[in-house]
Amino acid sequence: MSFDKKLLEIVACPVCKGKLDYEKSSQRLICKADHLAYPINDGIPVLLENKAERWQEAEA
């Protein structure tokens, strides 16, 4: 099952309530403000702080 990008309009980071970005290559939702990555399992975002991983933006 793939992730429905329309969800990005209604979901928010559970830590800061900020915007999340979809990272297709790793199937994660990224909070750039908190540097957290939330997994997407079977098309469903797991927006639990204890399931998030630290995220660092790749250098261009």
Curated annotation (Swiss-Prot):
GO cellular component: cytosol
Family matches, as Pfam families: Trm112p
Source superkingdom: Bacteria
Family, similarity comment: Belongs to the UPF0434 family.
Matches recorded under HAMAP family: UPF0434
Protein name as annotated: UPF0434 protein Ssed_2824
Source species: Shewanella sediminis (strain HAW-EB3)
